[in-house]
UniProtKB/Swiss-Prot annotation:
<dbReference type="GO" id="GO:0005774">
    <property type="term" value="C:vacuolar membrane"/>
</dbReference>
<keyword id="KW-0926">Vacuole</keyword>
<feature type="topological domain" description="Vacuolar">
    <location>
        <begin position="574"/>
        <end position="584"/>
    </location>
</feature>
<feature type="transmembrane region" description="Helical">
    <location>
        <begin position="229"/>
        <end position="247"/>
    </location>
</feature>
<feature type="transmembrane region" description="Helical">
    <location>
        <begin position="351"/>
        <end position="370"/>
    </location>
</feature>
<feature type="transmembrane region" description="Helical">
    <location>
        <begin position="516"/>
        <end position="534"/>
    </location>
</feature>
<dbReference type="GO" id="GO:0034755">
    <property type="term" value="P:iron ion transmembrane transport"/>
</dbReference>
<feature type="transmembrane region" description="Helical">
    <location>
        <begin position="276"/>
        <end position="299"/>
    </location>
</feature>
<feature type="topological domain" description="Cytoplasmic">
    <location>
        <begin position="535"/>
        <end position="554"/>
    </location>
</feature>
<keyword id="KW-0813">Transport</keyword>
<feature type="transmembrane region" description="Helical">
    <location>
        <begin position="651"/>
        <end position="673"/>
    </location>
</feature>
<dbReference type="InterPro" id="IPR001046">
    <property type="entry name" value="NRAMP_fam"/>
</dbReference>
<keyword id="KW-1133">Transmembrane helix</keyword>
<keyword id="KW-0406">Ion transport</keyword>
<feature type="topological domain" description="Vacuolar">
    <location>
        <begin position="405"/>
        <end position="423"/>
    </location>
</feature>
<feature type="transmembrane region" description="Helical">
    <location>
        <begin position="466"/>
        <end position="487"/>
    </location>
</feature>
<feature type="transmembrane region" description="Helical">
    <location>
        <begin position="555"/>
        <end position="573"/>
    </location>
</feature>
Amino acid sequence: MEKDFTERSTKGQRKLANGVVENIESKLKNHLDNNNVINKSVNYEDVMCSNVKLSVHDDEYDIKNIKKDVCNLSKLSEERLSNNISLKDNNKVVKNPEIDTKTARQQYKKRLNSTQSTMNIEGNINNEKDDIIEDYDDGLIRNMDYEMSIVKNKRNNNNNNNNNNNNNNNNNNNNNNNNNNNNNNNNSNNVDNRKRNKNEECYDESYCISDNLDEITSYRNKLSLYNKLRMCFNYFGPGWIVAIAYLDPGNLCSNLNVGLIRSPDPTLEKDYSGYYLLWIMVYGHMLGFIFQVLSMRLGHVTGLDLASLCSKEFDRTTSTIIYVLVQIAIWGAHIQAIIGTFIALNLIFGISVKVAIFYTLFEAIIYSFLENKSLGLLENVLSFLVGILAVSFFVNVFMTPINFKELAISILYPRIPKGKEIDALALLGSIISAHIFYLHTNLTAKKKSVICNDLSLRRYNTLGTIESGGSLFLSCLTNCIIVLTFAEVNLKSFERRDQYNLFTAYEVMRKSFGKISMYIWSFGLLSSGNNSSFMCEYASKSVVEGFLNKKINTFVRVFTFRLMLFSLLYMFLTLNKYTLDQLTNFINVIQVLLLPMATIPLYRFSIHENVLGEFRLKKFPKFAVFLIIIAIIISNVLLTFLDFVHKETSLITIFFLVIFSFLYFGFIIYFFNIPIKKNYIQRN
């Protein structure tokens, strides 16, 4: 056993290995001591459930091993019943022969749900008061394979005893003693073989660097670059899922519209109007990074998501209003995802749009299966699709002649072309959406179970910041590439920019960069639609469970929402498929107007001592985030007003606009003044 752990360099890791061996050997010695195996009333259910709670393996290991062992409990129950029948004559009865398999499976599901979609760094040791173990060695990781070997050894002993009782009634006691002694010797040999056999070692050291957080902090500078990178990659997950929201079909539609902006002046030798709104793209991702870090910190410190905090703190009416508005934002993003998916299928395979929309129902079945199977598997699928998306659009960089001087000017010098205020607003709405902050807090809150003190909390916050920064940098780069690709398209004088949308964007790519670029665009759009669809389902689940405080069957929830959205889209398709582009832009505007429904409560909880304690925003950061939220709210209303000024609007439209503005600002002012009374901080 010690030989298997020679690759570990720190003292704490050697102690971890030695402690596991000593723990298991002592248990084997106690459980397999001569004739006491049968007389002891060991409850197998307790053994299994305790190990489910204390398992430190990742979700993949749980699925392959623990689930299989828990499902075999019924077989152990039958053997115990048969042992009782055969041992009645000797007054030796195993107590509690019926194993409560239902309870054991519930414990397994509870353990799996509490830590799924998170990678293990410190070891998933339960932090609840009932599970705190005083002794250091007892607090070490329990090895599931060794525990199951105990169960199997007991079962073999019982079977051997039964055979001896049936065949040698006169010498029953002697045979039992001999068999037990032989089995004990075999068991000790098996333990030695397990120590020597590296292939049977179930502890996966790739998911754990050290169990001693103080030691990690003390020797931080001595950790190799490889170990530091491994720590980062073991954490990664939530930030990359959230980054999908920055690369959905709504973003692609806004990027297309912004990149195809052209100046009305026909005398320009080279028109760079498509570059003008890149500053919104870059600064929008910076704002997104700030709020993603706040979301991540809120989940790590409290162990609750933003929806649960709103439900617990605000009254039912306010919570219901927020829930409805956030759910509208999710449905809007989901509609955009479905649009992007069946447009891509139509472009790649030539399938009719009305037939391609049924693919979304099949996609719902896939999502339901992945969520019920393992959220770790779902994360892997989403990461693969994100990779396809990034590669597809990065290839366009080598086909596009970019003017880097104009690019730098457009980022550093904010400007909005005349009459393009609604495009600027839609671009901001496509970048930052309300539901992504609810989703991010939900994902990071699940890591609370493996955060055991303030040192690990700070480390997790650092890793979360690195992950959010890296994922949003990749997202910003990809979106800018899409804008620049369409900004460099040479439109003819007789062609209008309004002629191109998600349906016809492939024609622009084909004319300017060749046929292969058309397929690159289509595959990127398909990957974006699938990614965004899965992400919206995940966000919907977290919002429903957080606000309503109840779990809804995945299959029922997914199909109900999909059928509703399917009916709405089919109605649009029966009218004219090109209205979908206008629908996508309208949804982006709605997204940015609903953004305060996430940023305001996130800000309120992030500055309150009862929620984040010493990790709350203080002084300058607190004031800076407040100004950002106010600037977003004012820009929303101002850009909407300017867009109406450039158009001919009726008195009824102006009347509704004024009423909406009063209601909008009134609710926001009320939202800012709701007191936070409860204490959510969990001190480690």
